[in-house]
Design a protein with these regions (language model features):
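Sec-dependent N-terminal signal peptides
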Residues: 4-15
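N-terminal targeting sequences that direct proteins away from the cytosol to non-cytosolic compartments
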Residues: 20-30, 34-36, 43, 194-244, ...
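Acidic, serine/threonine-rich low-complexity disordered tracts
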Residues: 20-89, 94, 98-209
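Short, exposed beta-strand/loop patches in secreted or surface proteins that constitute
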Residues: 24-27, 49-53, 119-128, 151-153, ...
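Extracytoplasmic/secreted proteins, especially bacterial periplasmic and envelope-associated proteins
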Residues: 84, 96, 224, 263-264, ...
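Conserved polar/disulfide-associated segments of primarily extracytoplasmic proteins
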Residues: 88, 95-120, 234-317, 321-325
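Short, exposed beta-strand-loop hairpins at the edges of beta-sheets
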Residues: 152-177, 301-304, 314-316, 326-338
Length: 348
C-alpha cells in the first residue's frame, strides 16, 4: 500500500524535454510521458496509448481487454515510431511493429488506424496556437470520428494536448482516461495498462472507531488525526494498510502563474508505475487565491483495488505550497467517508 501511494509523489524537475514536430508546447513533454485514450468508435472496449521517448521516437499501443460476451480474446498492438524531429509536420522515418501481425485478421487495418491517429492528431494540433489552458474547444471536420466534431485541447495532456473528441450528438467518441510518466527504463507502467476494470471493493473494510485525538505537524502545518494512526517517517502517517497521509512542501514551478498551475496539475494528475489515475472519475479545482484541491480515483493493478486520494495545496505567501495527500482504499473510504473528510478539512 505504502509503495503504491509513495509512487504518486513527484519532483518538480525538468530532465529532457521535447515537443511534437511543428508543435509549440506550453508545457514541454518530458521523456517517458504518456497518455491513454478510450476509443469509443470500436465495437469492443478499446484503448490507445501514446508514449514519447525523445523528440524523434514514440510508441503507440492499442489494447482491448477480453470481451467475454462477444467471445473475443485480449488484443494488443504496439508500434515504435521514429520521426524527423526537424520537420514542421509529422514525418515518419521508420517504424518497428513490436507485436505479431496475424494474417487473415484485421491487424493490417488496425496498424493503419494507429498511423492515422498519429498523423491526424499532429495535423490538428498544428492548427492550434500554444495551448495554455484546460479544455480548449476547437470545432473541426474529422471523418475518422464521424464528421464535424469538437476537439478539446488541454495543456495538462502530454504530446498532442488532445483531451477529448465529442461528436455532433454530444457523445465522446474519444476520451483521455489517464496520463502518466515512466520513472525508469524498467518501468512497465505504459505497457501494463489494461484499462480500468470493475473491481470488487475490499470486503474486509470496517467502520473505524475513532481513537484519542492528536494533532500532528510538519513544516509548520498541522492536521488532526487520532491514536489509530502511526507515524512512519517525519512527514508520513499510516492507518494500518488502509490509508496513508503525507505532508510536504511543493515549490513553485515557474513565476508564470498560469504555467505554474498547469504544470502542477499535470504532475499531480500523472499516473506512476502500476497506479493509474482515472481521469473521468477525478477532479481538480484551482481557487482564486491559488489553492488547489484534487479528488482522484486511481486503479492500482498490483493490488487490484481502487484508491481515493485527496490532495490539497495551500499557497504560501513566502512562495510555494503546503501539501497534503490522503490516500485510502475505496472500500474503506466509502464506509468511513466522514472520518477521512474530517481529517482533510483539519489541514491548517
Amino acid at each position: 500500500m505504502k509503495k503504491s501511494f509513495l509512487s504518486i509523489l513527484f519532483a518538480f524537475t525538468f530532465f529532457s524535454v521535447f515537443a511534437v514536430p511543428g508543435v509549440k508546447q506550453f508545457i514541454p513533454d518530458a521523456s517517458g510521458e504518456y497518455v491513454y485514450y478510450k476509443d469509443n468508435t470500436f465495437k469492443r472496449e478499446s484503448y490507445i496509448g501514446i508514449l514519447v521517448y525523445d523528440d524523434a521516437n514514440y510508441k503507440i499501443r492499442y489494447f482491448a481487454p477480453t470481451d467475454e460476451a462477444s467471445k473475443l480474446p485480449e488484443k494488443e498492438m504496439s508500434i515504435l515510431v521514429s520521426v524527423n524531429k526537424d520537420s514542421a509536420f509529422w514525418d515518419m522515418t521508420g517504424e518497428y511493429i513490436m507485436t505479431q501481425v496475424l494474417p487473415g485478421t484485421e491487424d493490417a487495418d488496425l496498424i493503419n488506424y494507429l498511423h492515422d491517429i498519429l498523423y491526424e492528431f499532429s495535423a490538428r494540433r498544428n492548427k492550434m496556437e500554444v495551448v495554455d489552458a484546460m479544455n480548449v474547444p476547437s470545432t473541426q471536420d474529422y471523418a475518422q470520428f464521424g464528421g464535424s466534431v469538437t476537439i478539446f485541447f488541454d495543456a495538462i495532456i502530454p504530446i498532442f494536448n488532445v483531451r477529448d473528441i465529442v461528436d455532433s450528438k454530444g457523445e465522446k467518441v474519444l476520451e483521455c482516461v489517464c496520463i502518466g510518466k515512466l520513472t525508469s527504463s524498467e518501468d512497465k507502467g505504459f505497457d501494463s495498462f489494461k484499462g480500468f476494470p470493475q473491481v470488487a471493493e475490499n470486503d474486509d473494510a470496517q467502520k473505524i472507531k475513532a481513537g484519542k485525538s492528536m494533532k500532528v505537524s510538519y513544516d509548520g502545518k498541522t492536521v488532526k488525526l487520532d491514536s489509530n494512526w502511526t507515524q512512519s517517517l517525519e512527514n508520513i502517517w499510516t492507518l494500518g494498510d488502509e490509508a496513508l497521509l503525507t505532508m510536504a512542501f511543493v515549490p513553485v514551478a515557474s513565476e508564470n502563474e498560469n504555467f505554474n498551475n498547469m504544470y502542477i496539475v499535470r504532475k499531480l494528475m500523472s499516473s506512476s508505475q502500476t497506479s493509474y489515475i482515472n481521469f473521468p472519475e477525478s477532479t481538480v479545482n484551482i481557487k482564486k487565491n491559488g489553492d488547489m484541491i484534487f479528488n482522484c480515483e486511481s486503479y492500482d493493478s498490483a493490488s487490484n483495488k481502487n484508491i481515493i486520494t485527496n490532495k490539497i495545496l495551500k499557497k504560501k505567501k513566502s512562495g510555494g505550497y503546503d501539501f497534503l495527500s490522503l490516500a485510502v482504499y475505496q472500500g474503506d473510504y466509502k464506509i468511513n467517508k466522514s472520518y477521512f473528510d474530517k481529517i482533510v478539512k483539519s489541514f491548517k
